[in-house]
């Protein structure tokens, strides 16, 4: 029970933090809970697709090759998870009347990502220990939130394109809302999967740089928040 609570705490804390960064017009809490729940549920199709793709990859490449590491982490995990998280946010919030400011998109996508991260964290911690919970609280959960920040920026541009009647731009930016966080996610997971001293140095430098960037980017987007327009 203690580990379960500890596993949920970082995701909930980050949802509260991103909620407070919305300085112009707070999002309905009911909507955010819905998005969070959809993010939790998105773990189910993600797990199924990951198992299927992993089996497909193993038909063509050996598990101990660099090719497999790249395919599995970028396509078999990152692409699938970011797609599922984006869909969770879209199904819950895209048509909601509260989605009327640009920063709203970041709040929604981060909330969806943290719903996903919360249940994933619980599953990992149930099979782990206190050290697992702390490590994931400091690394994995914030990484999901950062993916949500990246996703949210492009998600917001896609929403504005729809309001302008630009279907091509909308479609392009919805794809980017999955592809761009996939890159960060894929690099993160691949670095953890490779066994080399320099990789671990790269990983921790990467985490620090991305964390600092994401914090500054959220503050900037919050400060420049504006109403969505056609």
Where do the language-model regions lie?
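Hydrophobic alpha-helical segments at protein termini of multi-pass membrane proteins
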Residues: 1-230
């Amino acid at each position: 029970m203690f580990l379960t609570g500890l596993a949920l705490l970082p995701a909930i804390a980050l949802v509260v933090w991103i909620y407070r960064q919305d300085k112009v017009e707070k999002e309905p809490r009911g909507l955010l809970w819905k998005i969070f729940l959809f993010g939790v549920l998105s773990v189910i199709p993600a797990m199924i697709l990951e198992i299927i793709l992993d089996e497909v990859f193993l038909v063509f490449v050996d598990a101990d090759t660099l090719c497999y590491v790249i395919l599995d982490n970028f396509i078999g995990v990152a692409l699938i998870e970011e797609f599922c998280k984006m869909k969770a946010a879209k199904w819950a919030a895209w048509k909601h009347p509260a989605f009327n400011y640009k920063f709203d998109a970041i709040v929604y996508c981060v909330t969806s990502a943290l719903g996903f991260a919360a249940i994933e964290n619980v599953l990992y911690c149930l099979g782990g220990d206190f050290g697992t919970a702390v490590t994931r609280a400091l690394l994995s959960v914030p990484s999901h939130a950062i993916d949500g920040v990246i996703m949210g920026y492009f998600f917001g541009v896609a929403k504005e394109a729809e309001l302008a009647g630009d279907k091509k731009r909308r479609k392009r930016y919805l794809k980017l809302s999955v592809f761009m966080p996939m890159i960060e996610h894929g690099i993160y997971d691949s670095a953890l999967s490779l066994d080399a001293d320099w990789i671990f140095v790269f990983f921790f430098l990467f985490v620090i740089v991305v964390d600092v960037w994401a914090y500054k980017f959220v503050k900037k987007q919050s400060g420049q928040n504006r109403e969505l327009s056609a």
